[in-house]
């Protein structure tokens, strides 16, 4: 059987560019090369697409603080529709070999917010992960929280600020509604980019200003005192949940540097040391949240577990990290699904969903 050509899209014009490079490296290293040929489609920080050399595409590959995408001489253009070649060399207009499926691993803005997914749908390319709507909904913390709350799922109390109403609530009003500490977050960022923990008014004003540097909408939420538990979900119509893992912090909260730069910032415990009935409860909630937001392929569901075993959903990440310390592949490894098999299954799910989508009627 001929091998499938998998286009790994990574990098991106995003605050999480370097995280994406780390994830892409691990996927390239782990993918089953007896089944798949890899085509590296790197997006630089200016948003330009390139075809990268699979043998030499990263600088400082083993240094998360300085990892970078190597320049490529081949710029990429895309042709939408059912063409034999969906990708062409932008310099000379010559078609590039057909890509059978896309594995997007562009974290953050323009990568997991539905933008990239919409482009791939227009191009009629199968792709790993959630579709346009669910990607956008999960990326937007305000929208995701409203949908989860309306479905009867437990979330932290919150208020949403926009550039037009950011001064509608005084700090005293915010504190009265949500208490202290607070967390202030850009609505559409991941990896704790622009997130601040707030204990007083001065910190609050600084945190809101910082969050608005990254987004036009900001979520202010009640700080939940509890253990940080994560669960991986895999599947399309009948998703499965992994065992749970725990992030044990050695710092104030799970900030960007704690996640990706500081090796001593947090400890990942897999499986989480929680009673089996609590583990099963979180797994069931994770699947319910996944289905509520219309996810497909994969997502990581992050929750807080309070002292009385109340489960509070924090957020859902539709393109979880695949870095050396990322929880998603570790959770499936602990559940009996190895890294290589996980990647293969994600590609299979992408092809299954693409086939189902193309079977839908488009005419009356």
Curated annotation (Swiss-Prot):
Binding site for ATP: 175-230
Keywords of the record: ATP-binding, Cell shape, Cell wall biogenesis/degradation, Cytoplasm, Ligase, Magnesium, Manganese, Metal-binding, Nucleotide-binding, Peptidoglycan synthesis
Residue sites binding Mg(2+) 2 per the record: 315, 317
Residue span(s) of domain ATP-grasp: 145-348
One annotated GO molecular function: metal ion binding
Binding site for Mg(2+) 1: 302, 315
Reactions listed under catalytic activity: 2 D-alanine + ATP = D-alanyl-D-alanine + ADP + phosphate + H(+)
Co-factor requirement: Mg(2+); Mn(2+)
EC primary class: ligase
Primary location: cytoplasm
Cellular location(s): Cytoplasm
Pathway(s) of this molecule: Cell wall biogenesis; peptidoglycan biosynthesis
Top-rank taxon, per record: Bacteria
Any one GO biological process: peptidoglycan biosynthetic process
UniProt cross-references to NCBIfam families, sorted A to Z: D_ala_D_alaTIGR, PRK01372.1, PRK01966.1-1, PRK01966.1-4
Biological role stated in the UniProt entry: Cell wall formation.
Family, as annotated: Belongs to the D-alanine--D-alanine ligase family.
Protein's name according to its UniProt entry: D-alanine--D-alanine ligase A
Gene assigned in the entry: ddlA
